[in-house]
């Protein structure tokens, strides 16, 4: 009798693009983050809209206003959508918009396992379909940890559940379907200096309903 494999037990493919923005953009992003350090606010969790600050689930700092860099970032992120859909064998994404945020993870910061799709917004005109995470940081790197852990949806018959850890390498862009369970592993930043944080630009490709 043939053995069947439950697809939910397997890891979903992701795409990893090294040297995505280049050193000049990395420096521009670092300059933005450091200059706007006082404007970062605690991250929240929740089903879109106004979330709740829950440091036992998510501990990090967030900036949504990317100023004059936003348009250039959107152009760069949008340029890889079609190739990513083909490489990951996803259904076509009718791009409605890009949702961007800049997140800083410092000493002890993390984000527990979650998915990026929302289910309780029937009035929304679009949904998160593809998640992108772009990493940058100061050199030499001032933190350890902070890996992106991608999980299989379900455990295998023996109770084990597959996962893979992706290091937050500077100038690397990671893409995966927004419904994939994932987490940010805890960060160690001995100096505690904001400039030594693990910085990430989260980009959600929103598909029109």
Language-model regions: role of each:
Residues 102-104, 121-142:
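Short, conserved beta-strand element in jelly-roll/cupin
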Residues 97, 101, 173-176:
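Membrane-topology and secretion signals of cell-surface/extracellular proteins
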Residues 2-88:
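Non-heme Fe(II)/2-oxoglutarate
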Residues 110-118:
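Histidine-centered catalytic micro-motifs
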């Amino acid at each position: 009798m043939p053995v069947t494999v439950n697809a939910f037990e397997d890891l979903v493919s992701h795409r990893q693009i090294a040297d995505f923005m280049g050193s000049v953009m990395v420096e521009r992003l670092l300059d933005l983050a450091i200059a706007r350090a006082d404007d970062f606010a605690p991250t929240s969790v929740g089903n879109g809209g106004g979330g709740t600050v829950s440091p036992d689930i998510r501990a990090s700092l967030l900036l949504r206003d990317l100023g004059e860099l936003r348009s250039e970032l959107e152009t760069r992120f949008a340029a890889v959508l079609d190739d990513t859909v083909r490489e990951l064998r996803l259904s076509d994404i009718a791009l409605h918009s890009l949702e961007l945020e800049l997140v800083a993870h410092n000493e002890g910061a993390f984000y527990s396992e979650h998915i990026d799709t929302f289910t309780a917004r029937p009035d929304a005109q679009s949904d998160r379909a593809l998640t992108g995470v772009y990493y940058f940081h100061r050199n030499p790197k001032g933190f350890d940890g902070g890996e992106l852990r991608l999980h299989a949806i379900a455990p295998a018959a023996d109770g084990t559940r597959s996962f893979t850890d992706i290091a937050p390498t500077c100038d690397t862009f990671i893409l995966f379907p927004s419904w994939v369970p994932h987490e940010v592993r805890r960060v160690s930043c001995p100096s505690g200096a904001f400039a030594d944080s693990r910085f990430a630009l989260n980009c959600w490709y929103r598909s029109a309903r």
